[in-house]
């Protein structure tokens, strides 16, 4: 009888140990973070942080210069800035649109600056392609390079930002004297697109206002 009791107690202890071990394994499986003490846990959020980062206005102006600064654009952008400033400061009826988008308001002026810059670069065979070009067969051979496509898309983004900034900075009032606009627009565009000191003829620094996104 005594022997049977010892066997029974031993069996119960064995079963209890097995149950406890199983429960411990289940806890570790349900909480991998607690079971990762012997290895470095992988942070998927940090790993994916650099994937598909969109270019922001601030990054485009200040830190991503090398990403789009190709000779293809830089060769003509200073010349085109001067030409565009003259074009958008005049009284060309093509740039006076109804609905508050004329060149006497910042939004209309920024549209004029961007469209005129796009046309000027195109005239110099440095055309800005549409970032959503459609079939690959429609893309000219000279811009089939993937790297050039990336540079072009980024350049368009920066240029759109800079035309808005320059329009907001230079067109301080609806009745601003258009004769003084070219002297402001040209340097403002150049300084915004290429802040590097050797990118254009140095001049007094401009304090640009905060970027305003128009709906």
Curated annotation (Swiss-Prot):
GO terms for cellular component: peribacteroid fluid; peribacteroid membrane. It is found in: Symbiosome, Peribacteroid membrane; Symbiosome, Peribacteroid space. Induction: During nodulation in legume roots after Rhizobium infection. GO terms for biological process: nodulation. Residues 1-20 form the signal peptide. Keywords: Membrane, Nodulation, Signal. It comes from the Eukaryota. Belongs to the nodulin 20 family. This is Nodulin-22. The lineage of its organism: Eukaryota, Viridiplantae, Streptophyta, Embryophyta, Tracheophyta.
